[in-house]
Design a protein with these regions (language model features):
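Short coil/linker segments at helix-helix boundaries
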Residues: 62-148, 152, 156, 160-181, ...
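TPR alpha-solenoid repeat register
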Residues: 53, 166-170, 182, 215-216, ...
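Short coil turns that delineate tetratricopeptide repeat
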Residues: 45-48, 108, 162, 211-212, ...
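Residue-level detector of the short coil/turn that links helix A to helix B
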Residues: 28, 145, 194, 228-232, ...
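Canonical tetratricopeptide repeat
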Residues: 56, 170-172, 178, 185-188, ...
């Protein structure tokens, strides 16, 4: 009995590949092999067989990739122009990367003796160049307006960076100077494609670049904001903004967005506290001063609005939008004065700012100074003065 069990054990230990695995290894094309892997995976004897099956997919797809890459290399050497099947090359690169990660997953599992004895560690180096090819493949698809294909390749490249398959790749080899640029483009495409979770992943990487930080943050905020259909949606977005702002309190985009949300939700206490804290940290914070001026405009407090908007203009004296709001506040202040001489002085001051706004943007492309300027001229000169008539005409052009 014991002898029979020993024979049975030996037979099991040294058994060859299962029929399910043999079927995969007989396949001549990647498509056939992949279909058989998907069909027979559950019938394979163990995790080692599954790893071997996926490694075979790596071999087939890398051959497809390498065959086309060899043509490119020979063209460079011989100065020929033999045709290259870029579609086959790119698909080979993609399939090799996906299969290598699946192979790694099963290759790292304990065997029947409870030991981890990986056989395919070389796949990381083997598919690394194929992985890099997906950057160009995605960009080519993007320029051809094939968003789905671009994201297929870029997502595979981007998401695989953190794969344990590549843990042993040296850091200097992993350094990719184009990473933030591709991440920014990937964020934009993912947002357009309604894959918001992936867009946020891309944004977080793109924001590490000084060149793309501002644009990537705008995309991230747009994604986080969503449609804001309910009160709860708005509160969730506010909390997201708070978290971001807590980690980057000098970021004026976050400050302005959080201020706008507080204003839209009529959270006056929180809004004023936000702006006061920003100014306590930096009294010359232009956004905080401008937003505080707008806060007081909403509260019909012209004096405080004027005070803050003037301070904002001291920091950015060419900001026409602030000039228009300041001019409007001065008009309100002037109209409320009983003293004719006092009104005259304030209207003159309003005209100074509104004339400057007109000078900076004569065609009113960025801000509309027209009505406020006409109102100031009307208040100072009356309805029939030629200057008032001209200001009225300017406002209508």
């Amino acid at each position: 009995m014991i002898a029979a069990m020993m024979v049975l054990g030996a037979t099991s230990a040294f058994a060859g590949d299962s029929d399910a695995l043999k079927a995969v290894l007989k396949a001549k094309t990647y498509a056939d092999a992949k279909a058989l892997v998907e069909q027979n995976l559950g019938s394979m004897a163990n995790d080692a067989e599954k790893a071997k099956a996926y490694n075979y997919l790596v071999e087939l797809s890398m051959k497809q990739f390498n065959d086309q890459q060899s043509i490119i290399q020979m063209n460079q050497i011989t100065k020929k122009n033999d045709p290259v099947d870029m579609e086959a090359m790119n698909e080979g690169a993609y399939n090799a990367l996906v299969a290598a990660q699946e192979c790694y997953k099963y290759d790292q599992l304990p065997n029947a003796k409870g030991k981890i004895a990986p056989k395919y560690d070389n796949n990381a180096e083997r598919v690394w160049n194929a992985r890099i090819q997906l950057v160009s493949a995605g960009d080519d698809a993007r320029t051809k307006n094939n968003t789905t294909l671009a994201l297929k390749y870029w997502n595979a490249w981007f998401n695989s960076e953190s794969s344990p398959l590549f843990n042993k790749i040296p850091a200097e080899k992993k350094a990719e100077p184009y990473k933030e640029q591709v991440a920014f483009l990937g964020a934009w495409l993912s947002k357009e494609n309604k894959d918001m979770a992936q867009a946020l992943k891309y944004c977080d990487v793109a924001m590490n670049s000084d060149e793309y930080k501002k644009q990537a943050l705008n995309i991230k905020l747009e994604v986080l904001k969503g449609d804001l259909k309910t009160h709860e949606d708005s509160l969730k977005y506010i909390n997201n903004l708070k978290d971001l702002y807590a980690n980057d309190a000098k970021n004026e985009i976050l400050l302005d967005n959080l201020n706008s949300m507080f204003a839209s939700m009529r959270m006056d206490k929180e809004q004023l506290e936000l702006l006061d804290n920003a100014l306590a940290a930096d009294p010359n914070n232009f956004v905080a001063l401008a937003d505080k001026g707008m806060y007081y405009i909403a509260k019909n407090d012209a004096d405080n609005a004027i005070k803050n908007l003037k301070k904002a203009l001291e920091i950015k004296p060419e900001n026409g939008a602030v000039m228009v709001y300041l001019g409007a506040c001065l008009n309100v202040k002037a109209s409320n004065l009983q003293d004719p001489n006092g009104r005259k002085v304030v209207y003159q001051e309003a005209i100074k700012y509104l004339d400057k706004a007109k000078e900076l943007d004569p065609e009113k492309k960025q801000y509309n100074w027209g009505y406020n300027r006409y109102q100031a001229y009307y208040g100072l000169y009356g309805p029939n003065d030629p200057k008032t008539k001209q200001a009225e005409a300017d406002s209508q052009n």
